[in-house]
Each structure stands twice: as C-alpha cells, then as structure tokens.
Design a protein with these regions (language model features):
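Positively charged n-region of N-terminal signal peptides that target proteins for export
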Residues: 1-7
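C-terminal motif of bacterial Sec signal peptides marking the signal peptidase cleavage site
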Residues: 15-18
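Short helix/turn-capping signatures at newly exposed starts of structured segments
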Residues: 21-156, 160-166, 175-180, 185-186, ...
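A short macromolecule-binding patch
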Residues: 170
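Short regulatory "switch" loops immediately downstream of catalytic or recognition motifs
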Residues: 197
Length: 232
C-alpha cells in the first residue's frame, strides 16, 4: 500500500519531464492543433488500458511504428533527461501525430521495457469514454472511476488520486490541488502530519472521497498515466 502514497525518484522525474513537454507545446499554434482535433472528431479513438495503447505495450521494449499506417503517431522525438537528485540519466521519447503530442515515456536503456507511460492525445480514450480534455466533473462519474484525496508523506498533505483500475491514473500527481474548489482544497492541505512522524502512520490509511462538485468546472483531464514498475 505504501506505493500508493509515495512517489519515488523516477516517478518525480517522469512528472517533471511531462510538465516540461506541456510547456514546450505552447509554442505550437493552438488554432492549428484545435483545427486538427476538430477535423478528426469523428474518428474512432484508440483505447487505452493498463497494458498500453495501440503498438505501445507496457512491459515491452519500444518499437517505432511511426512509418506504419497504425495512425497512433507518426513522429518520434528522442532526447535525454538528467535528474540530478538521483544522478540519473534517462532516455526520453515523445511521440506525435503531426503537431499533437500523443505520449511520452523514459527508459534507462534503449531496449528497456516501458514501465511508465504518459498519454496526452485527445484521440485516445479509456474503455469508459474518458478522454483528454473532458471536464473532471464528468470524467469521475464514468464507470470504474475512483476519485479521492489521499495523504502523501513526501508532500505532507493530501493529493488528488483519480484512478481507473490498479495501474492507470488521471493527471498523474496534482500536489498543487489546482483542480479542486477552494473548500475541498483546504481539506487536502489540512491532511498533514505537521512534521510529527508518529502521526504519519495514522494518516496513511485515510482518504477523502471526491464528488464531481469537488472539482472546479474548468478542471479537465490533462493526461493519463500508467505505472507498471512495481510488478514482478
């Protein structure tokens, strides 16, 4: 159960990488991206499960399918990410369908299996219809969704936990709690051990269930995140 409450260094690196990618995309003409999304509005979406989406399979090495007619992505951008606190250098992969980012992930080595995957494409949805851009107030009402505030020892406060099954989460980690209404946000910030380690264990088992009204009307699904690191 500790895995739910704690984020290890690789997961933090993943979040930082995803965040930097989102900022980088602001340089793309938003009207062009929106036009492409609207043009493909009637296209049947790719379905994301905890096993992956399309040719992107979790627990398997990455196989570049950008030159095929699969349609999930047609461009791969490679790079490196150095996470100084862990002295860790990782290979980064960002996949695009024209100008729209589809997904990103990091690998320790080229042939390492994909164990974490962040999906940001509006052309991908869960089996229950939840997709990027959908209001959170609507998303959390869909079948199989779980939404709560859970205590996180690293941040010493409550964080938003929105999940679909065991390994698939929405919006990764939102320690800023910006998607919540002010009243609900205060409840999360009050979930703290105040530096007293004796109280931490008491908080670990507690959670606050979230309703659609706990989210701001403008809060939306920004990404999906699959984490399969802890499986044997």
């Amino acid at each position: 159960m500790k895995q739910i409450f704690m984020i290890n260094l690789i997961a933090i690196a993943m979040c930082l990488f995803s965040c930097s990618n989102s900022k980088k995309q602001t340089n793309t003409d938003p009207s062009a991206v929106q036009a492409e999304v609207e043009a493909n509005a009637g296209v049947k979406p790719f379905i994301l499960t905890e096993d992956g989406v399309g040719s992107l399979r979790m627990k398997h090495p990455f196989k570049n399918m950008s030159d095929t007619d699969e349609g999930l992505y047609n461009k791969v951008e490679k790079g490196t990410f150095y996470y100084e606190p862990a002295a860790m250098k990782l290979q980064t992969y960002t996949l695009y369908c024209d100008d729209v980012e589809v997904a990103n992930f990091m690998l320790e080595k080229q042939l390492s299996p994909i164990e974490e995957l962040t999906v940001t494409s509006p052309y991908v949805s869960l089996e229950n219809g939840v997709k990027v851009g959908m209001p959170l107030r609507e998303a959390v009402t869909k079948k199989g969704m779980e939404a709560m505030i859970m205590y996180d020892e690293m941040f010493d406060q409550g964080i938003i936990y929105i999940a679909y099954g065991k390994n698939l989460r929405i919006n990764v980690v939102n320690e800023e709690l910006d998607d919540l209404t002010e009243q609900t946000k205060m409840k999360a910030l009050a979930m703290t051990a105040n530096g007293d380690l004796a109280k931490t264990s008491e908080l670990e088992g507690k959670s606050i269930q979230l309703t659609p009204e706990d989210f701001k009307p403008e809060a939306k699904v920004a990404c999906f995140y699959i984490d399969r690191r802890f499986e044997e």
